[in-house]
């Protein structure tokens, strides 16, 4: 957590509570709460699967230890009954540095922008690793017509989860 007067200085990380809660919309009563085992994984951006059955959550690692941060996953999935982290292959996770940016879901699966890795981490709808789609300084993700769009430094990608995404250079 940060405070407005400190800018982006992080404080009280030991009090983090990485969880999803379900509240009664009329009374505010707590109906359920699901926690991640690793309390230093911050739940960030959210996207529903196209069938609205699963919630994808981009994660940001807040570990003091850089080794733990570099090994951290960037995607969690919540199916209404369980919250689980989705592993990222170790050799890829080290380049991501535990930082998931934007989040999107398409019929092809999940996407998490990873600007520190200059790419988009992609997963199947079930959460299995697909690959890292290269795009320098990628951050914003959007879905249009079932296809993933991604914005990065110098270009945007159309249908970014395809075998051959279409690049749209900026300023061209």
Residue ranges of model-derived segments:
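Short coil/turn segments that connect the beta-strands within blades of beta-propeller domains
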Residues: 51-53, 107-108, 145-146
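Short, conserved, GDST-rich strand-edge loop motifs in beta-rich repeat architectures
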Residues: 1-16, 58-72
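Blade-level signature of beta-propeller repeat domains, shared across WD40, Kelch, NHL, RCC1
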Residues: 151-172
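Surface loop/turn motifs at the tips and blade-to-blade linkers of beta-strand repeat domains
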Residues: 34-39, 87-96, 131-136
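Repeated scaffold domains used in trafficking and secretory/extracellular systems
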Residues: 40-47, 95-103, 136-145, 168-172
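Residue position within the beta-strands of beta-propeller blades
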Residues: 57-58, 112, 150
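Beta-propeller blade signature
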Residues: 10-26, 71-80
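Loop/turn-rich, solvent-exposed surfaces of beta-rich toroidal or solenoidal domains
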Residues: 88-125, 138-139
């Amino acid at each position: 957590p940060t405070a407005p007067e400190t800018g982006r200085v992080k404080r009280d990380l030991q009090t983090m509570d990485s969880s999803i809660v379900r509240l009664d919309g009329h009374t505010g009563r707590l109906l359920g709460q699901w926690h991640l085992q690793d309390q230093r994984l911050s739940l960030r951006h959210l996207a529903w699967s196209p069938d609205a059955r699963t919630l994808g959550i981009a994660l940001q690692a807040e570990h003091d230890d850089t080794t733990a941060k570099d090994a951290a996953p960037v995607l969690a999935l919540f199916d209404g009954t369980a919250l689980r982290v989705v592993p990222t292959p170790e050799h890829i996770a080290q380049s991501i540095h535990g930082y998931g940016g934007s989040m999107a879901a398409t019929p092809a699966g999940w996407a998490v922008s990873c600007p520190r890795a200059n790419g988009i981490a992609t997963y199947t709808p079930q959460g299995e690793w697909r690959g890292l789609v290269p795009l320098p300084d990628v951050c914003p993700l959007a879905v249009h017509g079932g296809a993933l769009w991604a914005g990065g430094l110098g270009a945007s990608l159309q249908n970014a989860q395809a075998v051959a995404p279409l690049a749209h250079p900026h300023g061209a």
